[in-house]
A protein has these predicted regions:
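N-terminal small-residue-enriched
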Residues: 2-95
């Protein structure tokens, strides 16, 4: 298997983390779920910086973003599968 561009930690996750520099819009990524090494392909719709998240499914306003099998926040703007997930469309539920 070649090196993955996106890591997902848990099968419950609906976002994954970009682990390469220079990921361009339209790139087909090799994605790996680290829990069991399951792999799949996903096309990224925007350029996404290393360390940032990508939606694995379509997410609507009010949905919970899940990373590491844990709630990491609430979606505040619609996000399509393959789009960048960050502070412009994700907020903490703490306040």
């Amino acid at each position: 298997m070649s090196a993955p561009q996106l890591l997902v930690h848990d099968h419950r996750d609906n976002v994954g983390v970009v682990v390469v520099e220079g990921l361009a819009a339209g790139s087909e990524m090799l994605c790996v779920i680290t829990e069991d090494d399951f792999d799949f392909r996903l096309t990224v719709k925007q350029a996404v910086p290393i360390g940032h998240k990508v939606a694995l499914t379509d997410l609507k306003v009010g949905d919970t973003a899940v990373k590491y099998g844990q709630d990491i926040g609430r979606i505040v703007a619609p996000v399509a599968r393959g789009e960048h997930v960050h502070t412009h469309n994700l907020r903490t539920k703490r306040w």
